[in-house]
Amino acid sequence: MTRSSLTTPPPHAGPPEAVPGAPAPGTVLSSHYGQCFGCGTEHPTGLHLKARTPDGTTVEAEFTVGEAHQGAPKLAHGGVLATAMDEVIGMSVYLFRKPYVTGRLETDYLLPVPVGTTLHLRAWCNGIAGRKAYLEAEGRIGAPDGPVAVRAAALFIEVNMEHFAKHGDLAAIEVEHPDYEVNP
């Protein structure tokens, strides 16, 4: 993965700390919003990522490239692959039990991904510095140890729930996450 300095953790960045209430190893992670294109179960043409944390520090997920996800005939659209990387990385910061948003996403496309292929995704955190999380992900064709088709490095920024209330739909947030407090 070719990373810029913006997605490389600074020397003082530390590993993520275990957070009380974070999903335990082996936990299947639920969708954060039913209509999310990446993980939502209610989105008609979404990726429908099914994710879990095998060890409490990484996230693994799969999705099968469908007809609605193609760019060139019978090949996954690069933007869809970038979305898959963004989503699995976003699910990995879910382990910190704090809201984050994508600040930067760098994606390397290594192999074409045909329609009908199951892409096996894995994401992990390389370090945290203040409100910034430095993360990576990879997508492998056909199996968890299959050939790497796509890699990503990302910078995610911690925000408060007020961010989503201000820029999104507060009523939808309250329905999906009644336990979150906005502007407590």
PLM features: what roles do these ranges have?
Residues 41-44, 80, 114, 154:
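Short capping/connector residues at structural and topological boundaries
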Residues 52-54, 124-128:
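Short beta-strand micro-motifs enriched in acidic
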Residues 62-64, 106-108, 122-124, 138-140, ...:
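Residue-level recognition of well-ordered beta-strand positions that form the cores
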Residues 1-28, 113-115, 126-184:
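HotDog/MaoC-like acyl-thioester-processing domains
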Residues 68-78, 83-95:
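A short, contiguous structural element within a folded domain that forms the immediate neighborhood
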Residues 3-6, 14, 87-120, 147:
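Hydrophobic beta-strand-centered segment that forms part of the acyl-chain substrate-binding groove
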Residues 31-76:
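Catalytic strand-loop segment that frames the active site of acyl-thioester-processing enzymes
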